[in-house]
């Protein structure tokens, strides 16, 4: 593929693990990288949470350290990650994000459960974790965390001009990438921010009404009518006018549940899906130049109704990342493998244009099996 620059360091195999705010399960992926370029993709897998575990995680949302519900959630997260990775091939490093329960960038607080030292001892591999704290300590939002990897992906696919990678998870986030810039931390290489609610309000609606874990394929929304008044009011929220970089807690738009409470199941799903698509359009309005393509990762790309609404709202080429040879189910897990190698090699993992941090900074604590934390 294009973008195969000469390696600065010998590439190593690393694993990355991600448990997102859609509560689907643990995504694990292997990546061969030198921390700058992508050399090769390895195996990827997802281990789904049980209904009981998913309920525990939902109950723990919004919890801060010290709360009993957070401790129970941590046990679920650690056990699921160990199960997902116990039989992986040997790797040099594991990048572990943990499960976000609460995120308040204005107060410089964030909470991901899951102890990297527990995983290091259980799996016998060095674990790099807690990627957000250093960034937030220097004034950053602590999120989004995948933009530097998105830059590497844009170069790997040989993008010839600006491209945007949109992740539609519980919260949506987008990275605008100029692949001609020689490093992701350099000015002009990346602009990244959360776009707003994505799958979370739709998923919560389905669970609340006993309709399942998600609107599979957007089939329910496709049968509904959009309530334009609710849509317009939702997209008038002041948050959408804030200049990036910016990040959002999963439940920041939880008031949407009350807004659609009087609608039928189909109309409620259609309206929330339109809000998610409209949030992406509001986000792209902050970009200084339009990307040639918007490549979509995350569970939302499997929602045909949401994808069609995003296409209509943006009016540019919108397609799933699989169309350019990437794995949308593994992308975020791969990102943490990539970031782990960057941390191990002293490279930045965020920059002013991705999180608002004062200067490029490398985040992440390091835990080796049977040893004290390294940093």
UniProtKB/Swiss-Prot annotation:
It comes from the Bacteria. It catalyses: 1,6-anhydro-N-acetyl-beta-muramate + ATP + H2O = N-acetyl-D-muramate 6-phosphate + ADP + H(+). InterPro entries: Anhydro_N_Ac-Mur_kinase, ATPase_NBD. It is an enzyme of class 2 (transferase). Pathway: Amino-sugar metabolism; 1,6-anhydro-N-acetylmuramate degradation; Cell wall biogenesis; peptidoglycan recycling. One of its GO terms (molecular function) is phosphotransferase activity, alcohol group as acceptor. ATP binds at residues 20-27. Belongs to the anhydro-N-acetylmuramic acid kinase family. This is Anhydro-N-acetylmuramic acid kinase 1. It comes from Jannaschia sp. (strain CCS1). The gene is anmK1.
């Amino acid at each position: 593929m294009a973008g195969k620059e000469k390696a600065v360091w010998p590439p190593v195999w690393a694993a990355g693990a991600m448990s997102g705010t859609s509560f689907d399960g643990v995504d694990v992926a292997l990546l061969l990288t030198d921390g700058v370029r992508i050399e090769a993709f390895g195996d990827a897998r997802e281990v789904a949470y049980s209904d009981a575990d998913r309920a525990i995680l939902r109950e723990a949302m919004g919890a801060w350290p010290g709360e009993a519900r957070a401790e129970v959630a941590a046990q679920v997260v650690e056990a699921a990650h160990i199960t997902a990775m116990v039989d992986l091939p040997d790797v040099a490093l594991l990048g572990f994000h943990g499960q976000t329960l609460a995120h308040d960038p204005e107060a410089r607080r964030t909470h991901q459960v899951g102890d990297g030292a527990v995983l290091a001892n259980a799996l016998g591999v060095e674990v790099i974790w807690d990627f957000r704290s250093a960034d937030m300590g220097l004034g950053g939002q602590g999120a989004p965390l995948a933009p530097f990897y998105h830059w590497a992906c844009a170069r790997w696919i040989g993008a010839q001009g600006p491209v945007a990678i949109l992740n539609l998870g519980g919260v949506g986030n987008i990275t605008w990438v100029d692949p001609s810039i020689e490093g992701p931390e350099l000015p002009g290489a990346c602009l990244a921010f959360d776009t707003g609610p994505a799958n979370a309000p739709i998923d919560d609606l389905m669970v609340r009404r006993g309709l399942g874990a998600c609107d599979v394929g957007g089939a329910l929304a496709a049968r509904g009518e959009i309530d334009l008044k609710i849509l317009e009011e939702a997209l008038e929220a002041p948050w959408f006018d804030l200049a990036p970089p910016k990040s959002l807690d999963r439940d920041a738009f939880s008031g949407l549940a009350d807004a659609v409470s009087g609608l039928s199941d189909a109309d409620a799903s259609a309206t929330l899906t339109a809000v998610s698509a409209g949030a992406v359009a509001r986000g792209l309005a902050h970009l200084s130049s339009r990307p040639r393509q918007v490549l979509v990762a995350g569970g939302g790309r499997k929602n045909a109704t949401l994808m069609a609404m995003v296409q209509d709202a943006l009016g540019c080429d919108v397609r799933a990342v699989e169309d350019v040879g990437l794995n949308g189910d593994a992308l975020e897990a791969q990102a943490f493998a990539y970031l782990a190698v960057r941390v191990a090699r002293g490279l930045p993992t965020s920059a002013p244009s991705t999180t608002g941090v004062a200067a490029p900074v490398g985040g992440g604590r390091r835990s080796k099996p049977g040893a004290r934390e390294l940093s």
